Amino acid sequence: MNAPTKDQSLRNLQKGGELCGKVKVPGDKSISHRALLFGAIAKGKTLIEGLLPAEDPLSTAECLRSMGVKISPIKKGDIIEIEGVGLNGLQEPQDILNCGNSGTTMRLIMGLLAGQKDHHFILTGDKSLRNRPMKRVGQPLKMMGAKVFGRCGGNLAPLSIIGNKLRGAVIGTPVASAQIKSAILLAALNAEGSTTVIEPARSRDHSERMLKAFGANLEVGGEMGRHITVSPGKDLKGQSIIVPGDISSAAFWLIAGSIIPGSELVVENVGLNPTRTGILDVLEEMEANINVINKRDVAGEPVGDIEVFYKENLKPFKIDGEIMPRLVDEIPILSVGACFCNGISQIKGASELRVKETDRLAVMARQLKRMGASVDEHQDGLTIYGGKSLEGCELDSEDDHRIAMSLAIASIMANSNSTLRRSEAAAISYPDFWSDLKRLQQKN
């Protein structure tokens, strides 16, 4: 099953076979980035257990090392040790900081560097990242006094940042984005006076939880916690962090277990932060057979195991802008799930997906149509007509990790075998995806 051909990026995908067993998804990508960044600017030692050893967090770690932060080698199963340098201890790097494919790395580091006075930094990334919008972060940072420059009026990398004296501000973000919010909060740690971020809707709150744990003077208020205020002056102190499993990675197994006949899965150690559990709400709307068990609290984050069993006659669903911040990364695999619902599913308010690693709305529509699905693409979403069988064919992840894994699940439900180009993209967030899929798949 799933053996790569001589071209390692081209993978053969076999149809059929239920998925059965237990799977532990890798550490949460969002939390992994933040643990590295906050540990770097804390005083003292930070220990991280369960850090995601995938390409995106590795990019963050390498950028921090280039600025003088000592981080132990990142290997699966190892506890990672960081020697923090304090809020103003980052060194001016001798070379360009390469963020790879990671938008989170670039955007959060922009906030981190904005207040490193008189230091000069240049950030770049791969072709995909160099075409993703950065002014949405640079503009609010400029309101605090940051000096940020880049291509296309500061919107595209490479970016040049000259550390400057920052001042606190009240900043309303145009979209509910944890990346924008977190960049501002990082900059606020080095500003004169308090900074308040006001979001149009609540986004994932890992930064707030973790900054509090590190000792930052941070308050959350306003309707639904949309106002976040940081007052500078307190040093961060190194912590011991345990990273739970990533619910965005778990989503592939939750949908697969729901749509593939005969499947029975337990996804273990999944982070259940309420700002991330929109996927569970949609599965409930689909009337999928899932149960959350062994609920517990780990290092300030709710965690549990999720059982999922195949169920016939899944209901179609509707997703709008209100829930979107809680499941934005799960839209590709939910699009696959919609193909096997009895009726028409609608996804709206998802225009943010057009500026991810790829234009995920266009790519999912294109690839699912190639398989014979009935999909209408709109400016801010998709309409998917369920109940139509899928055909095996030549598929392409277009270098997007979430697309690669979503198409892998879709291919199991096709009526003939498929191939997937650029399958290695899965390693961006889930290095063991293909081996886990092979282990879980039971051939008839």
Curated annotation (Swiss-Prot):
Phosphoenolpyruvate binds at residues 29, 103, 132, 179, 360, 402. The keyword DNA-binding does not apply. Keywords: Amino-acid biosynthesis, Aromatic amino acid biosynthesis, Cytoplasm, Transferase. GO terms for biological process: amino acid biosynthetic process; aromatic amino acid family biosynthetic process; chorismate biosynthetic process. It catalyses: 3-phosphoshikimate + phosphoenolpyruvate = 5-O-(1-carboxyvinyl)-3-phosphoshikimate + phosphate. Signal peptide: none annotated. The active site is at 329 (proton acceptor). One of its GO terms (molecular function) is 3-phosphoshikimate 1-carboxyvinyltransferase activity. This is 3-phosphoshikimate 1-carboxyvinyltransferase.
